[in-house]
């Protein structure tokens, strides 16, 4: 090619040329420069270099190098070289876009840096990992990189090696790797740096994968020490011709001396958890390697026990954790014993303290990151445990194995020998059985047999069974198969059919159903099994079913593995791949599969997790479903629970988490074998369908629920993020107390227990983060639940007054009239608007009813009319309620939708405890007295939350951020679209129980319809739809459920596109029997989810399989919870700070009397503090800003081309705009945040206006009158509250009736009657008081102007308007009555009417001094609160004449005059000094007659109980002589009498 303008491309000459390069050389014809390539470079005799140039016409010519010129590439000119610099860069991914700029990452000031060719592909945490390795290498010490699998430990090591070996990833590396003689011929000096060598030890399965990765990411000189060529490679290493040597554990053991003779810069060990046994040969070899810098790579540094952690760390950093004995005493024993479910506070506190000490000691030497770092790049994963019942044949075989003599020998091996030697049987006279097998050998053999039977009985007929097991199996089969001759005959005649027949295995029946479903759905399935013999059975089943499959196990060659994986991922015909659980390593990247089925568990949880990660990894595009099949009641269940035990221990030690404490067992402890360890737990068959896992999870769930409820109501630390707007109510059905279960919670999700019915399932509302309902103490496992009536204020028209913010309403039982009125007013609007705006299905959240067996305090404050009673008998309790929003990190357990049991006739209507309202975060102190000096206390999130205002419903809800601790990582800022949001909902905890067939057939004649309301949640800017269904990734349509309840069971019937109301409901409701189908909001770009695919969810599929006994989500079983954090914090505080309660169970929440007054002071917050989120700091007061945010306006403004949405900015956008504002005002983010918190509302609005108007000037118009409008709204609100207070006061003055007083007295005495009967000896007591105030105000003046309303007028208003009122429930411990008084007296806007008390121990429950509810401003004697209201005696002293009663002339000056409207009390009678009155007072007959004739305001059905209550409560009471300085003990005795 002729070059007409050579100067344009040949501007410079190169000093060095390489063969293969293109150049500009003089043409053979006209001497003009033309393009050619250098074939070779030679030197003449004078030392002058020449190049043999090859022209395009294949002619060659020798030309001096100085005449050659470099070709400069242009846009319209091809490349000058065969491979230019970019082509020679490593790594080079032509199909991938370069993610970042080409810049090196500096590791030190000396110049060591990660080359830009590698750095541009690294993530931040990977750079941090490389820097961690480099720092320890420079300091000459070892370390452990413990990242999860899939985070790129290999690339972090390669980055570190590239920096240390000064690699550039370009042509320069190629030249530096050339032999020295070539470098000399090119007049290039060899690298002056000292030659370094690194040894990498890895398992054989990943050895060549390391080689491929090193070749991909850089120009490294690598040798592999393995196989027949290892001697030659050792010679090269001795000549230091290599930089990196790869070898296996076995080769290292064989060549230890030769390798120790070399000087290694560092040794890097992959899968370092293999160095876990101090006595193992591999550990001894690894510790014998002569190298100071030992780097270990492992994702599971602790797999079984803490001894393994010590062994690995002691290899990497000898002496870091001390000796093995020291480590066991200082760390291992405290941590493991503190992890027990029944641990004491001292054990838990000591364990947590040891955990923190261990984490601090390892922090500089151990680096671990989890997959949460990349969860934004991973799809959703749903992990389900499916418990399969054994078939009758399997049970017979399993039971026969357990009844053998050998198993009996195993079970009695630890008992004292019968010879009287004092030794155990296995060490004395019963060392072996009759055939000479030791107990240990028998134990392992029979465990294997039990595992085979639990999976498939056909495994017992396997031809490859060992001789020893063959003998054992033959004896077992002879006994069992005599009862099943059909199996033996089929095994002989048609072994293939027998092995593939699912009827001999419960798991196979379940697997058959699953595979049929996944084949229809075109899903790709990975089927894992630990046993290759079981894989043979599964393979034969696939062949018999005509399924196209592939198989990969340990016998598969490496080259075949790649082919199988590639074919499975790409082919649409191959939907099943059978994989051995232990076949890990090279090429197993099954991202084409979206379903993983683990047919059998292993003892090591890492094996199962690694199997799951074969499909759940970066590159996976679909949601992954994980199903683990467990044989119910067998040894497999123990295996799975031991996995949970080990994973929880790993969370504590490695993750430094307060892991949930499920088990009472401690591994290796003879005293605490618990439910996991010991041969008695292994060789056992739990019959009758009982599930140990369910029992354990329920037990822990109840503790979690109780602690979180106590925390929420006692300590003021909310268990969920509240919604700002209410949602639709639900119709509820009572459930038997004994069926109230609680299960473990979700990450941002909440679990449930649910009975599995035939082909129908409830859509579980509690599994949606937006719809959990708050717990009652009864549901939390507490035996004392107080019934309460909640009332809301009404305006002048009788309509409910909405609260300012959200009202976190709980389901409550309304009277028939109230329900009818509410439905008439709101049903149309709710049904038409909510279903169109919402995408969340809401089903009944809570069902509550009393059980006679429960020692529940029964107090019904309001009387029920006959119509109400009739309504309850016919249609049940229609409880209308709304659940709180649950944050993703919350672990509160909400038991919902439990199997309904027979309801007692004398059932009690319970009200669920309320949550906290958005605008109310003042906290009320609450305590529980257990009668044994143990106290349960904390701060309650008060004031009492407001009830849902049905007319004020909206379909939007915004989560309120509680604090910085709740801010999640960056993936939370990504807007989740409907499909991903649906995935998130399904990753929740669920419990499903197998029901008996006879229960399924029973249907009630009066069904109760549950309205399921959808709701679009705008939390964190997430507008995505949330669908409640059990386990399907299908998202085409929403479903509605028609619920029918019976006495023994309830079932859901799917109704398409409509909801029909029960015929039992009042007539006006029937006009809305049909609802229009719901449509997604316009901003959603997703189609409607089809009903058909909803029905095809996993639970629907498994519903018809009889062998499925129990299903629960494994999503959040592992790890910590907020409740566990609370218990750990309380235990540490009590043991190490307060030095008390150290021997109490850690699950008991105890409030210290030393700090309770401090808590009370912290709980009494100012109105400005109420609007601020509570802090997570235990007993510290909440953080607040001086000028709280009061702007809650949400509006939409539209201009010509722009739409402005105010008040609904997503969280991720808010963070981004906040950073932009900080840069706009030229301040660091932290300083800008502090400035914002100090600024007033007007200043903040001005800042916002200035910022937004910079880009959009029209925004200024939106900020003009916002401040003034806000002030007006606040004043208007305060005025409304003042007017209502005056209205109530005037009403009180006009109607001071004796009936109201009597009502209070009757109710109080009835309560006292029940108290004295059940808990007078120190049980916890809770008094109920009703306050009429519904709204919190922005100013203290409005609160001061609120006038108190007595408890009795509340009862009248309840009967009058049937409107729910707020209820405040107080737990008062006997040891802190003064603190309670301070709280009751200082709480603004709240007056407490404590008229009834019950003695506890030797101290009074309430002792109110200087406080009178009727006249708070007056001073009273301490005895005023002792006798309470004696208005029942009014008739005794009533004047018989028309004129008023004449008072005596001489009146004592001591007591203060009573209020105008106050009835006579005991002290008024004494002050009158009327002998006639005093004689009547001491006349027993007169008192008895008076009590008999006392009018009752309660229903007639309670009259007998009321009279008995009055007489018993006042016996020997009125004339008891007490001095003014009476001690507490005498007061308590008086109250009990």
From Swiss-Prot:
Pfam assignment, any one: SNF2-rel_dom
Every Helicase ATP-binding domain range: 134-319
Subcellular location: Nucleus; Cytoplasm, Cytoskeleton, Microtubule organizing center, Centrosome; Mitochondrion; Chromosome, Centromere
Organism: Mus musculus (Mouse)
Gene Ontology terms: biological process: DNA damage response; double-strand break repair via classical nonhomologous end joining
Modified residues (Phosphoserine): 968, 971
Motif DEAH box boundaries: 270-273
Biased composition (Basic and acidic residues): 755-764, 834-857, 1276-1292
EC code: 3.6.4.-
InterPro entries in alphabetical order: DNA/RNA_helicase_DEAH_CS, Helicase_ATP-bd, Helicase_C-like, Heliccase-ass-bd, P-loop_NTPase, SNF2-like_sf, SNF2/RAD54-like_C, SNF2_N
Motif Atypical PIP-box per record, residues: 772-783
Gene designation: Ercc6l2
Domain Helicase C-terminal: from-to ranges: 510-660
Similarity remark: Belongs to the SNF2/RAD54 helicase family.
Highest taxon of the lineage: Eukaryota
Post-translational modification: Phosphorylated by NEK6.
GO molecular function: ATP binding; DNA binding; helicase activity; hydrolase activity
Listed PROSITE patterns: DEAH_ATP_HELICASE, HELICASE_ATP_BIND_1, HELICASE_CTER
CDD domains per record: DEXHc_ERCC6L2, SF2_C_SNF
Protein name: DNA excision repair protein ERCC-6-like 2
Main location: nucleus
GO cellular component: centrosome; chromosome, centromeric region; mitochondrion; nucleus
Listed Polar residues bias regions: 1295-1306
Keywords: ATP-binding, Centromere, Chromosome, Cytoplasm, Cytoskeleton, DNA damage, DNA repair, DNA-binding, Helicase, Hydrolase, Mitochondrion, Nucleotide-binding, Nucleus, Phosphoprotein
